[in-house]
């Protein structure tokens, strides 16, 4: 997520939000599916990542952002879904996100939700953040500690559609990479004192 006070205008058009209901990942062909029974799914393994017992966990230090683009799969048109679980206990301000239209760790788009009931869309370009949609309230987000939320991005051509728990949020027109792109996960810890852990239960990609 964009983590600076100043916001930079992004030359993309965001269409009006809707309340259309839609099932997750409706494509006919499953391109990728990971329920995290092992760590062989092509994710970047480092000290901030823990994959075991059917979960993908991002360990988040205070005031930390962790992103993880899948290394071994490249897609074009794709429907991406993931289940994110807020940690139990006293909540810190936390964000969970899907990455799409990714080239590398310096260039990708991010769709995320906060455990305060807001969502955002941002772009990282040449290592710099640009906010597209900034922290919009959305009642479909489950905010309770331990609650699960399903995030979905359906990217077709130059249009991406965003869903939270089956409810369509909005569309976005942009410029995807020309020769395929990568997808991934992200976690944001906005507490400046407490560390935490964000868990994802699955990732599925269809076309």
Regions picked out by a protein language model, each given a short descriptive name:
Residues 48-66:
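Short carbohydrate-recognition loop motifs
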Residues 172-199:
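Flexible glycan-contacting loops in extracellular carbohydrate-active proteins
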Residues 36, 201-205:
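Extracellular beta-strand elements of beta-rich domains used
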Residues 25-45:
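Extracellular carbohydrate-recognition regions
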Residues 36, 80-82, 146-156, 160-162:
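Short tryptophan-centered beta-strand motifs in secreted/extracellular beta-sheet-rich domains
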């Amino acid at each position: 997520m964009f983590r600076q006070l100043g916001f930079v205008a992004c030359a993309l058009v965001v269409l009006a939000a809707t309340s259309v209901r839609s099932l997750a990942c409706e494509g006919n062909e499953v391109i990728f599916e990971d329920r995290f029974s092992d760590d062989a799914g092509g994710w970047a393994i480092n000290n901030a990542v823990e994959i075991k017992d059917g979960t993908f966990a991002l360990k988040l230090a205070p005031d930390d952002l962790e992103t993880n683009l899948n290394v071994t799969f490249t897609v074009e048109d794709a429907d991406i879904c993931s289940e994110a679980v807020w940690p139990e206990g006293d909540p810190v301000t936390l964000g969970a996100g899907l990455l799409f239209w990714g080239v590398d760790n310096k260039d990708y788009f991010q769709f995320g939700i906060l455990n305060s009931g807001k969502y955002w869309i941002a772009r990282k370009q040449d290592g710099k953040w640009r906010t597209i949609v900034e922290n919009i309230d959305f009642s479909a987000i489950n905010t309770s500690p331990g609650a699960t939320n399903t995030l979905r991005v359906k990217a077709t051509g130059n249009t991406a559609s965003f869903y939270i728990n089956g409810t369509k949020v909005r569309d976005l027109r942009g410029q995807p990479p020309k020769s395929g792109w990568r997808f991934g996960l992200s976690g944001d810890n906005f507490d400046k004192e407490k560390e935490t852990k964000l868990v994802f239960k699955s990732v599925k990609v269809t076309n």
